[in-house]
Amino acid sequence: MSRSTGGSDPHVLVIVQNLPIQVDRRVLLEFHELLARGYRVSLICPKGPGDPAREEIDGARIYKYRPAPEAKGLAGYALEFGYSWLRTAWLSLVAWREGGRFHVIQACNPPDTYWLLALLWRIRGVRFVFDHHDLNPELFLSRFGEPESRGQRLQFKGLKWLERMTFRAAHRVISTNDSYRAVAIRRGRREPRDVDVVRSGPDTTRMRPIYPSEPVPEGITMLAYIGIMGPQDGVDQVLDLVAELRRRGRTDVRATLMGFGDCLEDLKRQCTRQGLDDIVTFTGRVDKREIAEHMSRSHIGVCPDLKTPLNDLSTMNKSLEYMAYALPSVSFDLVETRVTGGDAISYVGSGDIAAMADEVEKLIDDPTRRAEMSRLARGRVVELFDWAGQAKVFGDVFDQVLGRPSAGERAPAPVPQDVDEWGRPYVPLDDDAEFERYVLERRAR
């Protein structure tokens, strides 16, 4: 499937504002698919801690800017978006000068502001693909409720206008699930043929259980959370869950919380107030190597996202990642989480911590059920959501936008390796007896 790459090959400029590229699994997979099809790729994103201003990842040029200060209030968000837009616009000029003309801009939201930059570049013949990651009007409703004051109504109308302009400016729209696709068609007034679903599926040939180098002590059950720690992510519910399990006398439960975000320090203070510092670990930002270690030693994943207008329609990457690592998980009952998890996830009513604790205890006390859900989880993510199937749809969008011949059939999947890139042995998923032993013990033999 790979095509030769050179200065005459089509050039895609990818724009991401809300995350450094190293922690945006979806966009990493996307631009590697473009590279595999012979596209040149430049990418603009904010810096993470200690990141350089320029780097190259597997042939893609990465341009980074210092992120804006943490936003507070309407003025703060306006400053953040304006600052990021201007830095991105400047770096797009740099990317054009250093990497040659680009033919497509792929803008990933939030925010819904880069349609204007795409229109400015359209005079140079650049086309625009909108990669629709978030529903910003629903995000507003989830954080603040229905707008009541004049200022809130103005903000809400502004978000809807920005979203509408983004849909209108795009030549094609890529949605993360069918709920988002329905929004693009209904609210964005896009033709169904112009909106494609590309789910944020993992590369399950690489995202799979390893034998952890530091398994948890025998008799201990490790809960895992992975994801952003913002106001809408419900990570405080994980702490409430752990506190409830301790109140019930479960001294055998620990929790590892992986990720970062605006609420991280508040969550650490909550953890201390609830007396959980001895059993809860906050890892902060983690890389692929650390994620594999923590997920492979954990027993149960937690999806604490409350039922809100945004969360109900969003696919939670954490649920897919738990499944890739053969973790059964517990979740509040959300429309798209059910689409993702099927019977591999236990669902309870939104905010019902007691019911979630009940489900965790059932999984701890019923090894047979835990093993069955682990097997279901891994099988479901491989069969329905593996990135290989999503990648073809994604790459075909760009080929069609530029009128390129289709890449045709994808190359056969690589032969599974016995070890990961750091030399750590994978769990043999085709050995039924060993797989069942592993998912119960989460350690090497």
Give the positions of each predicted feature.
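Conserved acidic donor-binding segment of nucleotide-sugar-dependent glycosyltransferases
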Residues: 345-354, 362-368
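Membrane-proximal helix-turn-helix segments that form the acceptor-binding/catalytic region
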Residues: 32, 89, 93, 113, ...
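Acidic anion/phosphate-binding donor-loop and adjacent secondary structure
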Residues: 2, 185-186, 193-194, 201-218, ...
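Conserved donor-binding/catalytic core segment of Leloir-type glycosyltransferases
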Residues: 13, 215-242, 256
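Nucleotide-activated donor-binding/catalytic signature segment of Leloir-type glycosyltransferases, i.e.
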Residues: 265-292, 300
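A short, well-ordered alpha-helix in the C-terminal region of glycosyltransferases
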Residues: 362, 369-384, 393-396, 411
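Acidic donor-binding loop of glycosyltransferase active sites
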Residues: 171, 295-313, 327
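Carbohydrate-associated surface elements
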Residues: 179, 200-201
